[in-house]
Every structure is written in structure tokens, then in C-alpha cells.
Amino acid sequence: MTFTKQVVWDEVEMREVDVPAPVRRGRGLASSLRAELSGRGLARARDGVDEMTRGSAVVFGSSEGTHGNFLEVCYRRILAKPEWSRRLEKVHTARRQARPQGAAEQVRVWRELDAATSSDALLMNVFCYPRVWTQGLRALMGVSGGERIEFGVRSAASLERGLVNTTEIDMRIGDLLVEAKLTEADFQFGALRLVERYVDFDRVFDRERLEVTRLGLRSYQLVRGVLAAYAMDGRFCVFCDGRRVDLIEDWLRVM
């Protein structure tokens, strides 16, 4: 039998104890992860190919069949599949913030998946990798591994008065819809009335338990993703960095 000696500290000793800082939530966690990814991107940036935003984030470019934001083997597979390579063309929401330095500089349009912080690029690096479908991953995701993998697809759901709404899904594998999050602050806010139009809304959700603030319905993307999956009799999941406990809490709050 093992005995543990009880230790009693006096008031002076307690004052000397280093108390760890509280875990930051929301934007603090997102900013910390964004800074880490930007630092890694800077270490890998190539002169004349990769660029910087005004916020010191790296925007990678392609050169000689390679791309700074993708593993070479994944990038080759993406370029070989038109249905995958189309995802690379989505224009970055910031387009281009930097101005050309001189008349001779060529200005390229920034794409969303060029950004070092792109969750979609990370998703494609994982699922476009050869022989990714190990037995463990198939079991984890509940797929056979032979399903078609689609990126940036539109999933339809029925609205009132016979209308149809489409939601962009980051990835679809068979009946599984996947939303990817990396450095995004949250799952966005949206008007409650927009999801109330879905014919399945009251069948799926207890509206009294959804959080509505002055900004609108919290975790709007999650609610729409679930409704899209329900409409196709499918499943819905979120992939995020394990340190994003704020996103995990949002998921649990909605589910």
C-alpha cells in the first residue's frame, strides 16, 4: 500500500505559486494558431514566388509544377483531376491587398487555397494523399474508402414554398459532409429567419436551445451543415485543430 504525504502550504508560499494563465477562447485561440502558421509559412516562403499580405500572412504560389501550400504528391494528384483542380481557382476574399512594386512586376490573383492558413488546403493535403485510406481512418469516418471524394460541393435542402437552398460543403465523401476549420474565429452568425425557412428545421432542432444574440444565430454554419446532411439522409462532421476548444464547445452546444 502506498501512502501520500499531505502537504499544507501557508499564505506566503501560496503567493509564490505560479498560476498558469487562463486558456484563451475564440479570437485569441484563432490568432495564436494563425501566428504559428504564418511563422511556419515565412520559414518556407520562396523569393519571387510567394507573397505576403499586409497582415504578415504568407500567400503561396505555384512554380514548375509545385505549390508552396501543398505536398508535391498531393498537388500532382489535384492537378490531374479536373474536379479537384477547380477548387484551386476560388479567389481569395481579400483578392490582393499588396500593390505591385514597379511597372514590371506581374500581379497574380490570390486564391483562397494559396493562404498558409487555409483549412481547405490542409483538407486537400490530407485526403488527396495516396493511400490515405488506412483501416483506422476508414473506421473513424465510417466509410469504405472507395467513395468519391468531392471538394467545394453544393448540397441542396428544401425550403418553404417549394424553394431549394444550396450550401457549400468543404468536402463530401459518400454520405458524409465535412466542414473544415483552422484559424476561422467561429462558425459565423446569421439571421435566424434564414434557417427557419428550411422545411426540416423544427424536426431537427429545438429552436429554444439555439443561441441567438444581437449578431444573429450563433454557429450559423453548423446549423446549415446539419440541415444539409439531414436533407440527403447523410452525416455531418467538423474537422478542426485540437487546440480550438472554442470550436469544439460550439459544436457541442449545437449538437
Where is each model-derived feature located?
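Electrostatic, structured charged patches in enzyme active sites and in nucleic-acid/phosphate-binding
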Residues: K81-P82, V107, A116, D120, ...
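C-terminal/domain-terminus segments
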Residues: F236-M255
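Amphipathic alpha-helical segments that form well-ordered structural scaffolds
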Residues: A121, N125-Y129, L177, R224, ...
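Nuclease-adjacent, charged terminal/linker segments that flank catalytic cores
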Residues: M1-G152
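Structural motif
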Residues: D175-L176, R235
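Active-site metal-binding core of divalent-cation-utilizing nuclease and nuclease-like domains
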Residues: E147-G174, A180, E184-G190, R214-L215
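Catalytic cores of nucleic-acid endonucleases
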Residues: T183-G242
